[in-house]
C-alpha cells in the first residue's frame, strides 16, 4: 500500500515529499537515496541530521545513514521519544499542510502519484510564511544552497 515520506529542512522549512510503494524500512531507504541523488553533495550539509519517529519504517538506521555517493554516512538519524510529536514540530506542521491535499484515510493507491505529490510539495514550498515575514521556503532554500 502506497504512502508518503515527508522530509522537512529545519532552517527554511523546505519540504521534500517522496511517494513510497509501501510503508517499509526498505522503501524509506530508497526514498532517501533518491533525495541524496537529486541534491548531490549539498545533501550532506542540508540534512546533517534527521529526526524520525519510532515507526518500523525507520528501524534500519544504519541503512538510512549510509551514503550512496560517498564513503561513510550521509546523515545522522535521531529518534524522538515515544508519543512526543513536539520533538519534530516543523515536520508535524508540514504534515498538517500535506493533509489538506492528501487527507488521512484516503486510498493512496488510487490518489498518490508523483505529479500529485509534486503539486503539494510546490504549494507548501511557495506558501508565504509569517515566520519568514512573507517569504516562502523555496526562495530561502535556494539562498541557503547558494551559500554551500
How would you name each of these model-derived features?
Residues 1-16, 21, 32:
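Short conserved beta-strand segments at catalytic cores or DNA/RNA-binding microdomains
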Residues 12-16, 41-48:
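Short, surface-exposed connector motifs at secondary-structure boundaries
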Residues 13, 50-53, 88, 124:
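Short, conserved catalytic/metal-binding motifs centered on acidic residues
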Residues 17-42:
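Active-site beta-loop-alpha junctions of metal-dependent nucleic acid enzymes
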Residues 43-60, 81-83:
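Acidic/histidine-rich, metal-coordinating catalytic segments
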Residues 60-63, 90:
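Short, well-ordered secondary-structure micro-motifs
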Residues 64-73:
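Short, surface-exposed basic-aromatic patches at helix termini and helix-loop junctions that form
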Residues 74-148:
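Charged alpha-helix within mobile-element recombinases
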